[in-house]
Amino acid sequence: MSAFFDLLKSQTASHPPIWLLRQVGRYMPPYQELKGSQSLKTFFHNTEAIVEATLLGPSLLHVDAAILFADILSILDGFAVTYDFAPGPRIQFSPEQPFTFTSDPQTIFSYLLDAIRTLKQKLPVPLIVFAASPFTLACYLIDGGASKDFSKTMSFLYVYPEKFDQLISTIIEGTAIYLKTQMDAGAAAVQLFESSSLRLPSALFTRYVTEPNRRLIAKLKEQAIPVSLFCRCFEENFYTLQATQADTLHPDYHVDLHRIQKNLMLSLQGNLDPAIFLLPQEKLLHYVEAFLVPLRTYPNFIFNSGHGILPETPLENVQLVVSYVQRQL
């Protein structure tokens, strides 16, 4: 059984639950209107904006879950790390600087917690909150933002493995507090994002991805929190993620969900290539149907994308996919 799946399945009896990565974003005209000329950081710290943006998912798409409108860098407020968006993330961090998590998350994250309390009253569906998994957040910190190869992180990892392990441990402790605080405010489930894991050689995957996520999830399970783990990886590494004890595993589009579902009996979420949403609608539905056929009888399946919806995606295409899935299954 999967607590994450059961939570979402409670919303529908006729079809597998459906929600999407980055289901609220630049591809939505109402989102663009809501954001206006605000900077991203200002927008992410505006309680009213967080509420209104989060509500766009269920109101425009009729999905079975909402995900809090925030950023994976929002947690850095709790570590007193300076960051901004220009437009991509820029982080001011040195592995040599003191790095501890706040003892007062209620105050530091009041803008998020107030939004969650409001959303709990307004949403017709469960609210998912999220965080970067430990390795991914470490990559962003050491490289100072997003990177194609995370060369600074990999160099630091190889030269200073003990310091890197300590950084991972501190991230685990802080992330657990960050997410538990949001759950206490009224969120229903957690999604973890291991988005930088493709950078690791297979020989290091268990040490830096599987094991840190297992440790983090164990802390969340102290409060019986439903957890889904998204991970960018190839099939050979995906199987090791069973050891994390996540309720639901969510591979990106590199993994053949049709093949792995034959070898696993656990809750799976995913993993339609977001590029498919760009197709003309007739071709779009052809690919969605082909994706769904082998999964119709798979228990504990949650329909989702294999990465975030692309900014150039037509809103009506996303609405069509959600409607189609809910009618067909």
UniProtKB/Swiss-Prot annotation:
> Where substrate is bound, by residue?
22-26, 71, 140, 195, 307
> What EC number(s) does this enzyme carry?
4.1.1.37
* GO terms, molecular function: uroporphyrinogen decarboxylase activity
Pfam families the UniProt entry points to? URO-D (PF01208)
Gene Ontology BP, a term: protoporphyrinogen IX biosynthetic process
Q: Cross-referenced InterPro entries, in alphabetical order?
A: UROD/MetE-like_sf (IPR038071), Uroporphyrinogen_deCO2ase_HemE (IPR006361), Uroporphyrinogen_deCOase (IPR000257)
In what pathway does it function? Porphyrin-containing compound metabolism; protoporphyrin-IX biosynthesis; coproporphyrinogen-III from 5-aminolevulinate: step 4/4
What reaction is this protein's catalytic activity? uroporphyrinogen III + 4 H(+) = coproporphyrinogen III + 4 CO2
- Spell out the GO cellular component terms annotated for this protein, sorted alphabetically and separated by semicolons: cytosol
User: CDD domains, alphabetically?
Assistant: URO-D (cd00717)
Q: Where is this site: Transition state stabilizer?
A: 71
Gene3D superfamilies per UniProt: 3.20.20.210
Under which main EC class is this enzyme filed? lyase
Tell me where in or outside the cell this protein is found: Cytoplasm
Task: Tell me which UniProt keywords the record has, alphabetically.
Answer: Cytoplasm, Decarboxylase, Lyase, Porphyrin biosynthesis
What the entry lists under PROSITE patterns is as follows:
UROD_1 (PS00906), UROD_2 (PS00907)
* Subunit annotation: Homodimer.
Q: Which family does it belong to?
A: Belongs to the uroporphyrinogen decarboxylase family.
Cited function: Catalyzes the decarboxylation of four acetate groups of uroporphyrinogen-III to yield coproporphyrinogen-III.
What's the protein here called?
Uroporphyrinogen decarboxylase
Q: Organism, per UniProt?
A: Chlamydia pneumoniae (Chlamydophila pneumoniae)
> What are the leading ranks of the lineage?
Bacteria, Pseudomonadati, Chlamydiota, Chlamydiia, Chlamydiales
Q: Which gene encodes it?
A: hemE
